[in-house]
Amino acid sequence: MAPRRISVSETSRPVLPRHARLKFDETRQRWVILAPERVLAPDEIAVEILQLCDGARDVAAIIDALAVRYTADRAEIGRDVVAMLQDLADKGFLTEARETTP
């Protein structure tokens, strides 16, 4: 089944799809996203954002955490985070967590 593509907003709960994983590559000494036949090397800030994309937190909570951590303007961080996550979603490296049924 193909991953669901998402339109990222502050209410989205992003997560890496099952076929992709974020891993520290010892050989390259950098973080990479591994997917079938593809490797993406995100920068340090993207890695920090991706580590918060656990499917439990929504984008608003991720933005809030980063704004507090860096004592930065929430609106500016929000624009950057949503744009980065949307770019990854468009490339198939990010999807939205599904609701779990009891």
UniProtKB/Swiss-Prot annotation:
UniProt GO molecular function: quinone binding
One GO biological process term: pyrroloquinoline quinone biosynthetic process
Similarity comment text for this entry: Belongs to the PqqD family.
Transmembrane recorded as keyword: no
InterPro entries attached to this UniProt entry: PQQD, PqqD_bac, PqqD_sf
Metal-binding found in the keyword field: no
Pathway in which this enzyme or protein is active: Cofactor biosynthesis; pyrroloquinoline quinone biosynthesis
Protein role: Functions as a PqqA binding protein and presents PqqA to PqqE, in the pyrroloquinoline quinone (PQQ) biosynthetic pathway.
Subunit text: Monomer. Interacts with PqqE.
Protein's organism: Rhodopseudomonas palustris (strain TIE-1)
Official protein name in the record: PqqA binding protein
UniProt keyword list: PQQ biosynthesis
